[in-house]
Design a protein with these regions (language model features):
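A short, compositionally biased micro-patch
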Residues: 27-28, 38
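Conserved beta-strand/loop element in small beta-rich adapter and peptidoglycan-binding domains
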Residues: 16-27
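Exposed beta-strand and adjacent loop surfaces of beta-rich binding modules
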Residues: 2, 30-32
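SH3/SH3-like (including bacterial SH3b) beta-barrel domains
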Residues: 8-17
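SH3/SH3-like beta-barrel fold
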Residues: 33-37
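Boundary regions of SH3-family modules and the immediately adjacent low-complexity/disordered segments
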Residues: 39-54
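Short, structured beta-strand/loop micro-motifs enriched in basic residues and often containing a Trp
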Residues: 1-8
Length: 54
């Protein structure tokens, strides 16, 4: 499933920018989701900053 990032999400490893398209990598039940960006980096982000993309 593809998602679009709604707001910038800074982490210790870098920043996931608003408008970037990411793919679901692994889903966790605690309200977070693990996604992979177009560079292959894996991010652990809250679901509320993502919007489903068709």
């Amino acid at each position: 499933m593809k998602y679009m990032v709604l707001v910038d999400h800074p982490t210790a490893e870098g920043i996931l920018y608003k408008g970037e398209i990411v793919r679901e990598y692994e889903n966790k039940p605690n309200g977070h989701i693990r996604v992979k960006d177009n560079m292959g980096r894996i991010w652990f982000v809250p679901k509320n900053i993502l919007a489903k993309k068709s």
